């Protein structure tokens, strides 16, 4: 059998190198496991935040039955958003606590390994100290390289500047949006009871459909007896064959460039309905006059044209192709 013929010092050094490689391998495994856990956590957080507003929208639809006022709709939406954000923050806090506990356990394990290693001979301890000092010097020298890109590292000043710019842009956008909402526009409509009675009314772009109907009703009551005892909740506004909810604003349709079956909702210049013209082969840029009808009239005549074409407005449904059927 072959025997090792080196000195005791060389044997001790060989043993020290073997133990050092074993420690490095264990540290590498711990680091890989930590990176994998943090990656999984980040992907879970991203998924939760991407589904946040979809979940709020679904909850809002399921909890809203019938016609509601604009204030009620906004209050429900804000309450759902706050509750959803609170749940997400609580989950994230629990996940961070779990990761912190795991890091503490890893630190305790490393301290335990160091305590066991300290039981070795003084010669091996000296070699360990020298090796650790050399590694620390090398790491320190590498960390001070001025040519290394550190833009990805946390920087409080840079983050504060970015937050300030982001807030300025948000305020500027809010001011621009409020300015657009405050602009006046003229809406041409027909009170529809089987035939059209053309009227116009001026509203702000930030007004809701309900506010528009209230203003239109004031002008129609003196000419139509059936409207003198009617309330706004008994009226419907049909635009491009879509029944528009009372809580939507004209700004919503304009900014979304929404379309109906027979034309755009956002453009309120009016022309004659192409279905009443001899040539309906080309779409015009303007939109048709909307129709204001009593809900009772619609229920009695919804199987007859043109009411048979009408359907509830759905922001998720796209009418990319022009249709007059």
From Swiss-Prot:
GO BP terms in the entry: chromatin organization
Tissue: Widely expressed. Mostly abundant in testis and adult and fetal brain.
Induction description: Imprinted. Promoter methylation of the maternal allele may restrict expression to the paternal allele in placenta.
Modification type N-acetylalanine: residues: 2
Gene Ontology CC terms: intercellular bridge; midbody; nucleoplasm; nucleus
Alphabetical keyword list: Acetylation
The keyword Acetylation is assigned to this record: yes
InterPro entries for the chain: FAM50A/XAP5_C, XAP5
Keyword Acetylation tagged: yes
Source taxon at top rank: Eukaryota
Region named Disordered: 92-111, 137-160
Family in the record: Belongs to the FAM50 family.
Protein name stated in the entry: Protein FAM50B
Taxonomic source organism: Homo sapiens (Human)
Gene (UniProt): FAM50B
């Amino acid at each position: 059998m072959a025997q090792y013929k080196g000195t005791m010092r060389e044997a001790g050094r060989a043993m020290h190198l073997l133990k050092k490689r074993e420690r490095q391998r264990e540290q590498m495994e711990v680091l890989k496991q930590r990176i994998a856990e943090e990656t999984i956590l980040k992907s879970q957080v991203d998924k939760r935040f991407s589904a946040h507003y979809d979940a709020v929208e679904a909850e809002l639809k399921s909890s809203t039955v019938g016609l509601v006022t604009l204030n009620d709709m906004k209050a429900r939406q804000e309450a759902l958003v706050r509750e959803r954000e609170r749940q997400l923050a609580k989950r994230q806090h629990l996940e961070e606590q779990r990761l912190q506990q795991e890091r503490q356990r890893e630190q305790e394990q490393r301290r335990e390994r160091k305590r066991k290693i300290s039981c070795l001979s003084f010669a091996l301890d000296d070699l360990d100290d020298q090796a650790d000092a050399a590694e620390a010097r090398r790491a320190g020298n590498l960390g001070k390289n001025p040519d290394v890109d550190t833009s990805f590292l946390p920087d409080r000043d840079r983050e504060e500047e970015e937050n300030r710019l982001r807030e300025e842009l948000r305020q500027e956008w809010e001011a621009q949006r409020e300015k657009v909402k405050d602009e006046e526009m003229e809406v041409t409509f027909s009170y529809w009871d089987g035939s059209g009675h053309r009227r116009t009314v001026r509203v702000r772009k930030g007004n809701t459909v309900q506010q528009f109907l209230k203003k239109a009703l004031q002008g129609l009551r003196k000419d139509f007896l059936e409207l003198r005892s009617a309330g706004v909740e008994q009226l419907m506004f049909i635009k491009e064959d879509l029944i528009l909810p009372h809580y939507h604003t004209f700004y919503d349709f304009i900014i979304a460039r929404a379309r109906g079956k027979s034309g755009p909702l956002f453009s309120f210049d009016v022309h004659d309905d192409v279905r009443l013209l001899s040539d309906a082969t080309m779409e015009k840029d303007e939109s048709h006059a909307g129709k204001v009808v009593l809900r009772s009239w619609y229920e009695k005549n919804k199987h007859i044209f043109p009411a048979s074409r009408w359907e509830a407005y759905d922001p998720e449904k796209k009418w990319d192709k022009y249709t007059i059927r």
